[in-house]
Amino acid sequence: MSKLWSPIVAALKPYVPGEQPRMADLVKLNTNESPYGPSEKALGAIRAAADTDLRLYPDPVALGLRQAIAARHQVSVGEVFVGNGSDEVLAHTFAALLKHDRPLLFPDISYSFYTTYAGLFGIEAVEVPLDAAFRIDIADYRRPSGAVILPNPNAPTGIGLPLAEIERLVADHPGQPVVIDEAYIDFGGESAIALVPKYDNLLVVQTFSKSRALAGLRVGFAIGQRPLIEALERVKDSFNSYPLGRAAQAGATAAIEDEAWFEATRGKIIASRAKLTSELEKRGFEVLPSQANFVFARHPGHAGQTLAAKLRERAVIVRHFAKPRIADFLRITIGTDAECAKLVAALDEVL
């Protein structure tokens, strides 16, 4: 702490990102990255962009990328906003749309950046508890509020809500922004983007980090009706007019246009998720039903922190959260079948 800090800084509780360890022969299953490399078309576009005139600034409105996203999701270009990862898109969303006289609502077990952003932007927030089965109950959000944000599927649980439930939530909050964070939607959920034409209060946020395997490029986007997108643009242009470099725009555009690669890799991840769930359950784990590229599991005979440490000793890294109700759970990214087999073998040594 320093006397030179602005008053808000001392009160901040920064987000703690997943570890990026540098270990030989590591099975890295802790940050929900894709186990497969990006689309070859995306890699080719990135290389080509690196050969262009990098002394010039990139397109500040990322028109080509927004056109590709709009075409993929059958919306207009003016209904698409892009940013430097979905985290930046979410940050602009908090600043532009979520501060009101009544509190912002989000789940108590969820993406912890929501709490961080609420603190950063001075937003009053109420954390709504998950039910006994670790599910989001839409009825619990029928309370005084100024806005709502929740992930679907939720993280770290992986449990998704059907589109009908999401529509109920949006319809229950007319005149209030409802933000659906769909970082993991491509692994089994049904996107709320289809509801955007019907609801002027709905904003849907997605990322290229998971199903498009571009976590290292940092590209995210939001889709909503034009007034919501305009609010995000006003915040962006008051913060950083050039959030996406040439390589990011080119790579993401090629990635979203490569439908064959997308379907093949997400299909493999979904199949591997089913296999890993079965193997964990055979060994006594409780595994929550996942629609994400990870599973959330606990063993009745072993503390989560202890299991995570023993796996680490065997060069297998998973994510543990030392938080109430979920301290015995491990969040395990779906790797390749070979990586999942190494995880299972390590578990057989420690259980």
Curated annotation (Swiss-Prot):
Pathway as given in its UniProt record: Amino-acid biosynthesis; L-histidine biosynthesis; L-histidine from 5-phospho-alpha-D-ribose 1-diphosphate: step 7/9
Membrane spanning stretches: none
Keyword Chloroplast part of the UniProt annotation: no
Residue list for modification N6-(pyridoxal phosphate)lysine: K210
Protein keywords: Amino-acid biosynthesis, Aminotransferase, Histidine biosynthesis, Pyridoxal phosphate, Transferase
Alphabetical GO biological process terms: L-histidine biosynthetic process
Single Gene Ontology MF annotation: pyridoxal phosphate binding
Record flagged with keyword Transferase: yes
Entry-linked Pfam families: Aminotran_1_2
Gene3D superfamilies for the chain: Aspartate Aminotransferase, domain 1, Type I PLP-dependent aspartate aminotransferase-like (Major domain)
Domain of life: Bacteria
EC number: 2.6.1.9
PROSITE patterns assigned to the protein according to its UniProt record, in alphabetical order: AA_TRANSFER_CLASS_2 (PS00599)
Cofactor: pyridoxal 5'-phosphate
Alphabetical list of PANTHER family matching this protein: HISTIDINOL-PHOSPHATE AMINOTRANSFERASE, HISTIDINOL-PHOSPHATE AMINOTRANSFERASE 2
Subunit structure: Homodimer.
Family: Belongs to the class-II pyridoxal-phosphate-dependent aminotransferase family. Histidinol-phosphate aminotransferase subfamily.
Stated name of the protein: Histidinol-phosphate aminotransferase 2
